[in-house]
Structures are given as structure tokens and as C-alpha cells.
Amino acid sequence: NPDIDKIISYAPELLITQSPIANKDTVRLSEAGISLLTLPAPSSLEELYDNYAALADIFAGSIEGNSLAENTLADMKSAVNEAKNSCESIVFIMNIDGDEITAGTGDSFAGDLFSVFGRNIAENDTDYTTTAEELIKADPQYIFLARPLSASDFDSGLAEQLSAFSEDHVFSIDASLTERPTARLAETIRSVSEVMTGTNAETTEFTGGYAEIHETSGQ
């Protein structure tokens, strides 16, 4: 939760947050002369774009702001267009607990992001939840894991039924890259796409049937 006392001590004109602020704290901020802008946490790339546009509008005005937002997001949108159809099907998994799998579902930012590359097999699931049965049935071409999750966390019986394991199409990636969506996502999108298309093998190191995507110096 935001430290309201510390924020008030800094005396900003405007507080921008994606975290809910309690009513009593909203009153305190107002009494201190601090305006409050709450932006929704994006659940899709389009909503992320909208947040940038809203911020640009506030600080630069509607006309100049639209241009500023487009310039800021140009590289990300270019990376998205370049990455489309990098694979046939994909899934991003954050946790495994028996048959229950936490994944980037269609109603999440992570799910929408990975849908850029190909069909997200969890796109029709919600609340970050899918199952081992659904995973086996869909048999995604590529599986991405949120570190520290690795191939060894998969039950051997489950892994044997997924072609991504036998074809070395299992990769791990820093989950914070999808949890804190920023314009730097362009680098992540390109790295993931290059791994699947084989255009930058230096970003990966295969170990035990899967590979870790190394962060670039710009991330």
C-alpha cells in the first residue's frame, strides 16, 4: 500500500497510482492539495496503450499528447507486429500445484501479451487458472515458464505428454517482465519472438530440455 504520510511530505501536485487508495487517505491527499489520478492496471496491450495516452494527455494536452504517446509506444507496437505468428500455439505458466496450473489466461495482461506470438491455449480460461488436462489436450507448441519455475517442476508423466518438452520448446523468463508492463516490453517481445524463430540463439541456453531467456543489457 502507498505510504500516504511520505507522499504528503513530498508535496507533489499530482499522485498517479494503479493501487486503490482508501477513502480516508483520498481525503488526506485532497486536504494537502494533492490531486489523485487512478489508472486501471492494464489487462491487455490495448489498455496499456490507453494508459500511456491518458498520461500524455494530462502532461502535454490532447493534440500534443496523442503524438507523444504514439512516439513513446512506436517501438512496442513495431515489436508486436514483428512478433505476430511466431508460433502456432503457446502458453505462459507461472505455477504448478498438482493438476492446478496458474497461467496467463485470456483475461490477464500476460495472457494477452503471449497471444501476440500465436494462439494462447489458455485464452478461454479466466483468473489465471487452467488444468493439466487442458494443457495435455491443447499440447502447445511452445511453453514459457515464469522463473524460478523450471522443467523439473513438471511431473514426468505430464511432461512426457507434451510435445514442447521433446522438441526443446520449453523456456523460462523473468515473470516481472509481464507483471510490470512498461514500454521496455518491446525488448521482451523481440527476445521471445527471436527464440521461437531461431534468429537469436545467443539469448538462450538449453539445460535439461528447456532454456532460459537471458535478459539483455537494455532490460
Region annotations inferred by a language model:
Residues G104-Y128, H169-S172:
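His/Asp/Glu-enriched short active-site or ligand-binding loop at hydrolase and phosphoryl-transfer sites
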Residues L39, I93, N124, I173-A175, ...:
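Conserved beta-strand termini and adjacent loop/short-helix elements that scaffold enzyme active sites
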Residues P12-L15, L37-P42, A54-S67, D97-G104, ...:
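Second-shell loop/turn segments in exported
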